[in-house]
């Protein structure tokens, strides 16, 4: 392998006026000498925050991961940075030629642990959206097994958050991989960082 991102809740908020109503701008007459002013920037920011709540998107899937699609899930007009981690299957391990990896996960615990990681990130950095997607089943060489994307107003927060996310995922989330070699042999592996899988 090389590395890993998930589905929480996405929603859009849409407000429409009935056709029989006019907007306040259209119907209200302006007093003489009235000068229109832009709303305060703080007010605009508050409105943006209400319309776009932070999202934690977590997904395990047997389908091929699209880095572009996962990245797009965290894009926000409030953010100037999207940072990514993409883990792919490499073609060798200790001199053996790897043709694919096979992933398994204990899903209830895995999803719960990733949500904890997302909460930890939000306590440490001012990020907007977080997406963590991980493949299950067979993943051929060069395909992505993990995609993590984080958006933030400035790049430092999202870069640090992505690094923390993959390190924590490898250490805490119950995911196993089987390396399948060219000579028709295979071997189950665990992440060395996993405290819960440590040898006695």
From Swiss-Prot:
Function: Catalytic subunit of the molybdopterin synthase complex, a complex that catalyzes the conversion of precursor Z into molybdopterin. Acts by mediating the incorporation of 2 sulfur atoms from thiocarboxylated MOCS2A into precursor Z to generate a dithiolene group.
Stretches for region Disordered: 16-43
Main EC class the enzyme belongs to: transferase
Family stated for the protein in its record: Belongs to the MoaE family. MOCS2B subfamily.
Listed GO biological process terms: Mo-molybdopterin cofactor biosynthetic process; molybdopterin cofactor biosynthetic process
Location in or out of the cell: Cytoplasm, Cytosol
Note: This protein is produced by a bicistronic gene which also produces the small subunit (MOCS2A) from an overlapping reading frame.
GO cellular component, one term: molybdopterin synthase complex
Name under which the protein is recorded: Molybdopterin synthase catalytic subunit
Amino-acid positions noted as binding substrate in the UniProt annotation, renumbered to this chain: 154-155, 170, 177-179
Subunit structure: Heterotetramer; composed of 2 small (MOCS2A) and 2 large (MOCS2B) subunits.
Keywords assigned: Cytoplasm, Molybdenum cofactor biosynthesis, Phosphoprotein, Transferase
Main location group: cytoplasm
GO molecular function: identical protein binding; molybdopterin synthase activity
Protein EC: 2.8.1.12
Pathway: Cofactor biosynthesis; molybdopterin biosynthesis
Modified residues (Phosphoserine): 20
Transferase recorded as keyword: yes
Species, as recorded: Rattus norvegicus (Rat)
